[in-house]
Amino acid sequence: MNIIFVIIVLSAFFFAGWHQIFFIPVKGGPSPMEVLSKAMIESATGAVELAIGLVGVMALFLGLMKVAEAGGLLTILARLIRPLMVRLFPDVPADHPAMGAMILNLAANMLGLGNAATPFGIRAMQELDKLNPQHGTATNSMALFLAINTSSVTLLPTGVIALRAAAGASDPAAILPTTLFATIGSTTVAVIAAKLYQRLSPLTVDDGADIQQAPSNSNDEVKMPLKDAAQGYPLWVSLAALTAMVALIPVAVFYGRSVSPWIIPSLMVGFLGFGLVRRVRVYEVFVEGAKDGFRVAIRIIPYLVAILVAVDMLRASGFMDSMVGALGGITGSFGLPAEALPMALMRPLSGSGAYGILASIINDPAIGPDSYTGYLVSTLQGSTETT
């Protein structure tokens, strides 16, 4: 990310500088470097204003997610996933801590709980390495878990919905159908590709490989509180849930416009009702979750400032227009507008960088959150994860 950030800034600087050298002054018109300077200051200010605008929406969604988490929704999802995971990872014992960590990681990602998913993912890789006969070389299970994690099975892209709401989208939750379709497709492709590659290039273990388990570092321990997740539901329950999720795609496509206005109110009523049924003190828990939303919105300010300033430098220097003109005909032929290309390139590399680019694109008056490009970049952010 350091190299990418520097390349973006230097490209904008030298592109604007080149135009400045050959600039023909126009009375009352700014020079290229003046335009660049103004864009930098305005984008830095705009990044802070955007983060402040996100506070309320992030507080709402993280408050609701906290109620769902306290009520045990994470455990329910983990129990649904477990029978499928046991079959996808035959090399990992069903009762091994690695299996539990992977299940909890995927369940947290489904709910958009990135902060909870990250430590589970790290713990999963640590535990998988203990089963690794050749440390330093990824096993088939490690590769498959990384592929599934990167494809990001997501049911509720709360962060993207919050950003779209802050950008003034007419229907912030309208990306749920496209996100669901994309995440199912990407996960299916990830599993098939990983399994095929395992067959085409089987893992070989050196005879002299160290087969000792990696030592456990007590400082890296991640609390695994969901003991109930160790007992999964029957396989038919998991398959029924998977079928229902796939069936939501055509329903969302054909009836999405009618259903989407109900999504956010239904989420609030549903999660609060779920919390009441599970005897959660919904008000207190909601407030605690909302505090997390405030902290998240404030914490992303430095990332937004860095990325929005860099992207606006590209735009103000004229480099972005040149890139759009050069690549628009190529990428546009398969449905990827050149304006969305920076997002497609950044998403696998940096979550915070992609979030900043998404904010820049959907807050651009020429694009907006309700355009095709706005929907596309929102779906890219909501349905994939960094590698």
Which sequence ranges carry the predicted segments?
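Hydrophobic alpha-helical transmembrane segments
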Residues: V6, M102, L146, L176-P177, ...
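Hydrophobic transmembrane alpha-helices of multi-pass small-molecule transporters
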Residues: M1-A51, I211-A297
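Transmembrane helix-loop junctions in multi-pass membrane proteins
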Residues: G17-S37, E69-L73, L156-D171, A247-S260, ...
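Membrane-core helix-loop-helix motifs of multi-pass transport proteins
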Residues: L128-W236, G368-T387
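Membrane-embedded alpha-helical segments and adjacent helix-loop junctions characteristic
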Residues: M33-K130, V280-D364
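Hydrophobic core segments of alpha-helical transmembrane domains in multi-pass membrane transport
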Residues: F5-Q20, V55-K66, T150-S151, T158-A162, ...
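Small-residue-enriched core segments of transmembrane alpha-helices in multipass membrane transport
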Residues: L80-M85, T179-I184, I263-F271, G329-G335
